[in-house]
Amino acid sequence: CMNMAEGKVQDLRAVVDRTVKEVKITDVHTHLYPAEFGNMLLWGVDELLNYHYLIAETFRYANVDYDAFWKMTKKEQADLIWKTLFLENSPYSESCRGVLTVLNKLGLDPGSRDLDSYRKYFAGKTMEEYIDIVFETAGMKEVVMTNDPFDDQERPLWEKGVKRDGRFLAALRIDPLLIHWEKTWPRLKSWGYNVEQTLTEGTLAE
C-alpha cells in the first residue's frame, strides 16, 4: 500500500514537472517592445550587460569615475562591466548569474568568457529572429508591455497606428498622472483633453 502511494506521488510529481515545462506563460510585467518599435527594444549582449544592477555593481569594484562611465559608448560600458564582474571577479551575484543563464540558454558557452563571440552571435540575428528565439526558449505565449503615453518616442508610434506583433500586449503606465500631475496636465490639455491643474469633477471625469 505504501509503495502504491509512493508511486502515485512520483507519478504526480512527473505530471507537474512536465506540465510546468510545457505550459506557455504570459509575462504580465515587462519593459519589452515588439520589433515594430525599433530602437525602443533593447537587445544584444551589450544591452544585457548594461543592466542597471550590473552597472551599480561595477561601480563598487571598478576604479572608474561616474561621469567618465556615462561618457563611454554602450560597447565601452559593456566591456568595462564584463571585465570587472566576469573576468576580474567571480560572477556570483544574482544579476551576473542571470547573464550567464541567458548565454547558456542561447547555446553559447559562458565558460569561454569570450565577449566578442557573444557579440558575433547577436550580430548574426535580426531583431525579429531574436524575439522568436526568446519566446521559444522561455516558453512564453505573450508578454505585457509597459506603455507610457508621455514618452515622446513611444507615443507617435501609437498615434500612427503601428501594427505590432500580437504577442505583445499593451498596458498603460499611469505613474506620471498620479505622481507628476503638475507636469502632465498641461500636456493632456495640449492634446485636446478638457483638464485643469485643480482636480475638479470635470477633470476627473475626463
Identify the function of each model-found stretch:
Residues 2-26, 30-206:
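Metal-cofactor-binding active-site regions of metalloenzymes
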